[in-house]
Amino acid sequence: MSLIPNFFGGRRNNVFDPFSLDVWDPFKDFPFPNTLSSASFPEFSRENSAFVSTRVDWKETPEAHVFKADIPGLKKEEVKVQIEDDKVLQISGERNVEKEDKNDTWHRVERSSGKFMRRFRLPENAKVEQVKASMENGVLTVTVPKEEVKKPDVKAIEISG
């Protein structure tokens, strides 16, 4: 048990942990149901707070669009990469809560659990049938090859006169 109680509830925020940043809910402690509360919008609840904070870089090279997501502590089996309607890349995953044993005494809980999901609309030149994904050291890399840009055939016209 911590010597200093946490009066604010929940886990402490850590800017380096994408699963620890909580979304503030101004209606959370109201004693009555509210249509704007997280109960009405579960996708914005504390359990899904990592949705907001998962960091993703997107760069475009001459050959491909490359997405890199920081997802430390997850195995590749806990991450999904999907293409929806041939135009939306979706990266999602979930870190589950560690099983509790009744004989265990927890002194500190800083590693958090939760879900994340990020969606990106792909440009027209994306070859969605050739997408590849890999994961190494907590970084997911998704590579979406691009269609080759056809250079227009230019024909010079001689000007008479």
Curated annotation (Swiss-Prot):
Similarity comment: Belongs to the small heat shock protein (HSP20) family.
Organism, scientific name: Glycine max (Soybean)
Record localization: Cytoplasm
Recorded superkingdom: Eukaryota
Subunit structure: Forms oligomeric structures.
Gene Ontology cellular-component annotations: cytoplasm
Signal peptide start-end: none
Disulfide bonds: none
GO annotation, biological process: protein complex oligomerization; protein folding; response to heat; response to hydrogen peroxide; response to salt stress
Keywords: Cytoplasm, Stress response
Record-annotated sHSP domain positions: 47-161
Keyword Iron: no
UniProt-recorded Gene Ontology molecular function terms: unfolded protein binding
Main location: cytoplasm
CDD domains from the UniProt entry: ACD_ScHsp26_like
Protein name: 18.5 kDa class I heat shock protein
Keyword Methyltransferase annotated: no
